[in-house]
A protein has these predicted regions:
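Positively charged n-region of N-terminal signal peptides that target proteins for export
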Residues: 1-11
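C-terminal motif of bacterial Sec signal peptides marking the signal peptidase cleavage site
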Residues: 15-19
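Bacterial signal peptide processing site
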Residues: 21-24
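Secondary-structure "cap/kink" motif recognition
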Residues: 26-49, 124, 130-142
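Post-signal-peptide N-terminal segment of Sec-exported extracytoplasmic proteins
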Residues: 40-77
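Solvent-exposed, acidic/flexible segments
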Residues: 54-61, 86, 126-129
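Short, structured surface segments that line ligand/substrate-binding pockets
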Residues: 74-114
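Short, well-ordered, aromatic-rich surface patches in folded extracellular/luminal domains
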Residues: 97-142
Length: 142
């Protein structure tokens, strides 16, 4: 009888530890963006246009990167494609690294159902504050 109580205790303990470890929906993972000093330039363009804007000013690069990092909240949703699906209009940000020519990191900004999002391919989807979205998209209007 003591043997069964001991086994039950061990199994319940394992169950408790594994249940506490799964926090998929409540995760608060942070977006991984390059450091501003490692970025040579940022290309900003709409998916519907070939024309875009190239930002090379280091202060502007830092404002954009920090703005995204500080104003996003994890949605818990996964990104499983190279670009957003079922979204007709989005903004592409390409971060060109100083030491990695030809291989920029990419994020997508878009609006869906009155909310604004940042999607990093295969890393996740984050909710973005509206004012930050508007500030970044205003670069395309200049």
């Amino acid at each position: 009888m003591k043997k069964y109580v001991g086994i039950a205790f061990v199994l319940i303990t394992i169950l408790i530890f594994t249940a506490c470890g799964s926090n998929k929906n409540g995760s608060n993972k942070k977006m991984v963006l390059p450091k501003a000093e490692e970025v040579k330039e940022i290309d900003i363009m709409k998916n519907t246009s070939e024309d875009g804007l190239k930002i090379e000013n280091q202060d502007e690069i830092e404002i954009i990167i920090e703005g995204i990092k500080e104003n996003t909240n994890d949605t818990g949703r996964e990104s499983v494609n190279d670009q957003p699906t079922n979204i007709n209009d989005y903004i592409i940000l390409k971060f060109h690294h100083k030491n990695a020519e030809g291989s920029p990191s990419v994020v997508y900004l878009y609006k869906d159902k009155n909310s604004h999002y940042v999607e990093q391919p295969y890393a996740g989807i984050w909710k973005l504050r509206e004012d930050t979205f508007n500030e970044i998209s205003s670069h395309l209007i200049k």
